[in-house]
């Protein structure tokens, strides 16, 4: 049980002693006068002759007929005299009562603000103590009511304290505690009623009432969490809707999530101070001047951010890369970026989805009108008679590649297929996002589910098997395979996942394809789920043991530190919804993608 101490007055509010004594005296006098009146009336009726002649059943008629007028006059005189004497006092009582009521309401408003902060947890019986000097009340909360909840959820106290510790600057409301608990554990909060009483039974938990009337919970410092509490309190202050400060932007309703196929025109221009009003349009006459003019590092970074809305969390890599690219890149006309708002908008006549021309069987065409149907990234330049298709060039250079344009004989013959150098990629949203952001591979048009080659959003192992049957690849093609995360997130049994993976490898061998396997990376938004993390560990162990005759790239180790803890600085800030699965994905940021690419490229060889 927990005792809540407040400062309500111990005795009931009463009027002054003079008013109370006067009221008691008037009541006694009225009672005495009425009693005397009835006694005189009874004596008078007994002395009359009509009372002796009548029976007892006619007492009411005799009483009313004989002396109604006299009795009414007596009552009228009694109440009239009492009204005259009490009238001056009745005018004073409501005024005094109003003053006391206003004083009481002001005291209650002050007490409510400190009601929850003065809470003390105890295991005693339910008691009520009052003291006229201190004016304190103790009400209790029965702690034994929540024993069953703690037996079913043994870690709920520590989890709630962790949530309160992370919001120690401004406190947190009950609704926010429930949402944070669901994000932390994946389960709904076990209580729906009396949540305040339950939270106050947790040691070192305090509560107070804000100006808006919301109950704000916080955590007191102790020997165990004192250093952590100081660290949180010394962080950069952030206000929230449930604190006394200004409202925060984190609780303002956001726009629905944008899928990758939607915002091809990136909105990085506003952050890079490159507004369409201030940037002049690029014309064909100026392309030669732009190609020969020395380009600054900041301008090159802005151009990269326009075509690739990357996260600016690895500026060191961007700095080194563009310095190297500016030295090694040949002098050639700069292509117009079709994603830039400055590019001229031309009508593009696309074929229907069912009659899309096949890039594998159709020969290259030099006419600009025919190239529009093939999704070409560049426009024809002055003095160039040969239009280079995108698949004739190596992808955007990563860590170990240069910035020059080289022809590749083994590159997949498609504008949309995801590949790294000459190696096709097969995987789910992690590989799809990696190919889009780092390798500049495009998505296949007119598809509801985002896909690029063998990379499909929400791709499972069985889905990869079915997709592999519809793809024609030359024998001996080495395919980088990263698959299995979706099956694990959907709760599929591990033995079934391993069986499907064996069938996938077997079918690739039957098609004379060479798989280059990668183990699964840690799932940043499921690190709290020990069962799922253990399943990932066992599946990676299975890949290493069963596929010992194949090349296996360990990308899991580059996303954890030496103690086995996940490097959350390699992940984005929050999960994102994808088109092919209902499970949210916490993608790698720029640092994480570059780490994975570096590990993969280091292990590749022809």
Swiss-Prot record:
Begins to accumulate at the posterior pole of the oocyte from stage 8 onwards. Organizes the germ plasm and directs localization of the posterior determinant nanos. Oskar protein is required to keep nanos (nos) RNA and staufen protein at the posterior pole. Interacts with smaug (smg). It holds the Pfam family OST-HTH. The modification Phosphoserine is found at residues 270, 275. Its main location: other. It comes from Drosophila melanogaster. GO terms for cellular component: cell cortex; cytoplasm; endosome; germ cell nucleus; P granule; pole plasm; posterior cell cortex. Gene3D superfamilies: LOTUS domain-like, SGNH hydrolase. GO terms for molecular function: mRNA binding. The gene is osk. It is found in: Endosome. Capu, spir, and stau are required for the initial localization of osk to the posterior pole. Signal peptide: none annotated. Residues 152-221 form the HTH OST-type domain. Coiled coil: none annotated. InterPro entries: LOTUS-like (IPR041966), OSK (IPR033447), OST-HTH/LOTUS_dom (IPR025605), SGNH_hydro_sf (IPR036514). GO terms for biological process: cortical actin cytoskeleton organization; germ cell development; long-term memory; oocyte microtubule cytoskeleton polarization; oogenesis; P granule assembly; P granule organization; pole cell formation. This is Maternal effect protein oskar.
């Amino acid at each position: 049980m927990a005792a809540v101490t407040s400062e309500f007055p111990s005795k009931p509010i009463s009027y002054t002693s003079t008013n109370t004594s006067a009221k008691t005296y008037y009541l006694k006098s009225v009672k005495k006068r009425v009693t005397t009146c009835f006694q005189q009336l009874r004596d008078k009726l007994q002395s009359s002759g009509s009372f002796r002649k009548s029976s007892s059943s006619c007492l009411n008629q005799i009483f009313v007929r004989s002396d109604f007028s006299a009795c009414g006059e007596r009552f009228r005189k009694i109440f009239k005299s009492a009204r005259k004497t009490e009238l001056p006092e009745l005018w004073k009582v409501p005024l005094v009562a109003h003053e006391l009521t206003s004083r009481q309401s002001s005291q209650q408003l002050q007490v409510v603000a400190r009601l929850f902060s003065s809470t003390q947890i105890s295991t005693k019986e339910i008691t009520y103590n009052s003291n006229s000097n201190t004016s304190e009340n103790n009400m209790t909360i029965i702690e034994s009511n929540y024993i069953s909840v703690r037996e079913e959820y043994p870690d709920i106290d520590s989890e709630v304290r962790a949530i309160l510790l992370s919001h120690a600057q401004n406190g947190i409301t009950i609704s926010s505690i429930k949402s944070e608990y669901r994000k932390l554990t994946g389960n709904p909060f076990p209580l729906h009623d009396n949540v305040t009483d339950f939270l106050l039974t947790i040691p070192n938990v305090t509560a107070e009432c804000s100006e808006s009337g919301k109950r704000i919970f916080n955590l007191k410092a102790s020997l165990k969490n004192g250093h952590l509490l100081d660290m949180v309190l010394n962080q950069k202050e952030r206000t929230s809707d449930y604190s006394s400060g200004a409202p925060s932007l984190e609780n303002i309703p956001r726009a629905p999530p944008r899928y990758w196929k939607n915002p091809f025109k990136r909105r990085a221009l506003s952050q890079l101070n490159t507004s369409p009003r201030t940037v002049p349009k690029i014309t064909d006459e100026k392309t030669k001047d732009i190609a020969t003019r020395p380009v600054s590092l900041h301008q090159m970074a802005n151009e990269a951010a326009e075509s690739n809305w990357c996260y600016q969390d690895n500026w060191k890599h961007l700095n080194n890369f563009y310095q190297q690219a500016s030295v090694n890149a040949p002098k050639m006309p700069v292509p117009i970026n079709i994603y830039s708002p400055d590019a001229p908008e031309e009508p593009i006549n696309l074929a229907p989805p069912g009659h899309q021309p096949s890039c594998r069987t159709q020969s290259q065409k030099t006419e600009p009108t025919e190239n529009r149907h093939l999704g070409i990234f560049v426009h024809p330049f002055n003095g160039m008679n040969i239009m280079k298709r995108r698949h004739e060039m190596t992808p955007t250079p990563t860590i170990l590649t240069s910035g020059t344009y080289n022809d590749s004989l083994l590159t997949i013959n498609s504008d949309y297929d995801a590949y790294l150098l000459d190696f096709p990629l097969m995987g789910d949203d992690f590989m799809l996002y990696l190919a889009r952001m780092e390798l500049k591979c495009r998505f296949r048009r007119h598809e509801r589910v985002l896909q690029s080659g063998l990379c499909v959003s929400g791709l499972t192992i069985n889905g990869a098997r079915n997709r592999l049957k519809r793809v024609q690849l030359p024998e001996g093609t080495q395919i980088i395979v990263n698959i299995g995360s979706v099956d694990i997130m959907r709760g599929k049994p591990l033995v079934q996942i391993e069986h499907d993976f064996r069938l996938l490898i077997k079918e690739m061998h039957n098609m004379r394809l060479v798989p280059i396997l990668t183990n699964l990376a840690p799932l940043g938004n499921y690190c709290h789920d020990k069962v799922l993390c253990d399943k990932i560990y066992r599946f990676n162990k299975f890949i290493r043991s069963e596929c010992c005759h194949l090349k296996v790239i360990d990308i899991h180790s580059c996303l954890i530190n030496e103690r086995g803890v996940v490097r959350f600085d390699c992940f984005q800030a929050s999960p994102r919804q994808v088109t092919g699965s209902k499970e949210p994905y916490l993608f790698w940021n720029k640092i994480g993608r570059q780490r994975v690419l570096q590990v993969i490229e280091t292990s590749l060889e022809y």
